[in-house]
Amino acid sequence: MLPQLFLDRMKQMLEEEYPAFLNSYEDTRYQALRINPSKTDTDRFIEETSFHLQPVPWEANGFYYEKEDQPGKHPYHEAGVYYIQEPSAMAPAAYLDAQPGEKVLDLCAAPGGKSTQIAAAMQGKGLLVSNEIHPARAKILSENMERMGVKNVMVTNESPQTLAGMFTEYFDRIMVDAPCSGEGMFRKNEQACEEWSPENVQVCAARQQEILACAASMLRPGGRMVYSTCTFAPEENEGTISRFLEQHPQFHIVPVKKYPGMADGVAAWTKHPAAEIGDTIRLFPHHLHGEGHFVAVLEKEGTVSENYRGYCANGEEKPLAKGEAKAYLAGLQEFLGKIPADDAGRLFLFGEQLYLMPEHMPATRRLHVLRPGLHLGTVKKNRLEPAHALALAISPQEACHSWNLSVDEARAYLAGQTFPAEGEKGWYLITVDGYSLGWGKLAGSVMKNHYPKGLRKLL
């Protein structure tokens, strides 16, 4: 049941469009997935898949699928071949337009849809800091970054205020997918509907101002920031952006291409609208195939030199010294083929866990870090056991040994089953149709299952 006060406000906002908006709640909800370009070629996947896919206009790797496809129950999902994501939610990261080699912050990143989309655009180059303030959600974020094979991410569990105290004009781009009243998700999420109130809208709007102010201080001059919500409330959209611009005159709204069905922000819906508020973007379910969303693309005025680094209070993390790294490199070669020289210079020990640091990764002290780069393995006595994250980040060609499974065999592997195998003993990268899934270890004539017990499931 939609809240009556919400309906009354939407009727006032939409006027003659209101009946069409209301009818959209009776329509089937559109579902989509985003293909992971680090795992597969998009054209190849479309050609080979049995899924019924249609393109999402604003995201090159995004596709609507049909309910009977059930991509979440396919082993390809566990292999990180795609990420299931609400179609409208793909728009903000597309407009962020992150580039390889940049330093990018996703400030409110859980569960990870936008972060994994940003990571795909960065192609494993540069530094992505994906942050989430709530510990349980930060854990889910970290797991999703792992599943999608992201190599250059630092996952943190901090408040925006703590990060703002660490980083000054440091990031090239910042995504602020702000906590909101969730009105755009009422069709998808009954809990958001039950928790809604006009008072909560005001609370969210105030919190959004605080988050944006923190983000503003961390963005370098000339940098881009995208603000997004999944709500219709003007107080959290046009209102929040107008107030932010009034308090931060060094920012302006960037006019961007709007795709068919996207609407302009509306000045009349807020008391003191910014002059260019019409250049923000509204996504309504009665206009396009997706849920409710709002997007504002902002730019900070000024320019910086090519070698500009910004300020990080922690400084950069120091990698292992060459002599110390040498022993771990030997351990890695038990299950990896050739290790690039550049990677060999970025090894980092986090407790007993060996990681490959992203370029220019900030030092981890005074930060609650869940994932400082790509997890390579666990140090156990005098040996190195490969990490699940490593399996998901490499191709079969990069492993010393690999073992390919059919889809049905992969389902058994994901459930924790062992299987008979013959070959050279040792670690094997287990794949499904050539997509990496996890590790197995061949001993005797049995491939022991090393898929993490906490992730095992029946598909």
Regions found by a protein language model. Give the residues of each.
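S-adenosyl-L-methionine
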Residues: 131-169
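Mobile active-site "lid"/loop adjacent to the S-adenosyl-L-methionine
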Residues: 136, 172-213, 230-237, 260, ...
